[in-house]
């Protein structure tokens, strides 16, 4: 655990705050007139996925957690856990569904993802997907002809079970590039 101050805050770093691990989603230094400066933070809990907003005095001490990302291959789901394989040692590591979170929507078997570890405790704190993944459309509705006055979208079910909005010209069997951060369609591959 590295001690730091609010001047060390950056988007994406992990801090220990109120006895939980949070990833900094957004922060803003505010100096209102003749009042004391403070830092407004938007934090995402790595254990629950809940996003909170809080503010702390500028210059306050914060605990920065050193994290480590290890590439692992997602093998299969077993009950309430997901099994990953270390690409170097070939050890199989079960990870609970709570730690996997929303990443499950875009995880395909045999794909490589990063397991995020708390480096001090050597404990898994989450799963990080690549920014873009290619997934196949397994089910979608047929577009209505003539309904093209605006950007028409329709729901499409991907091979992982996720449902996203896609343009009307997408058909079953198409492979799409998806942004895993937002869950949005990028392009057809």
UniProtKB/Swiss-Prot annotation:
Signal peptide: none annotated. It holds the Pfam family EFP. InterPro entries: Elong-fact-P_C, NA-bd_OB-fold, Rib_uL2_dom2, Transl_elong_fac_P/YeiP, Transl_elong_KOW-like, Transl_elong_P/YeiP_cen, Transl_elong_P/YeiP_CS, Transl_elongation_fac_P. One of its GO terms (molecular function) is translation elongation factor activity. It is found in: Cytoplasm. Keywords: Cytoplasm, Elongation factor, Protein biosynthesis. The keyword Transmembrane helix does not apply. Coiled coil: none annotated. GO terms for cellular component: cytoplasm. Gene3D superfamilies: 2.30.30.30, Nucleic acid-binding proteins. GO terms for biological process: peptide biosynthetic process. Pathway: Protein biosynthesis; polypeptide chain elongation. Involved in peptide bond synthesis. Stimulates efficient translation and peptide-bond synthesis on native or reconstituted 70S ribosomes in vitro. Probably functions indirectly by altering the affinity of the ribosome for aminoacyl-tRNA, thus increasing their reactivity as acceptors for peptidyl transferase. Belongs to the elongation factor P family. This is Elongation factor P. It comes from Chloroflexus aggregans (strain MD-66 / DSM 9485). The gene is efp.
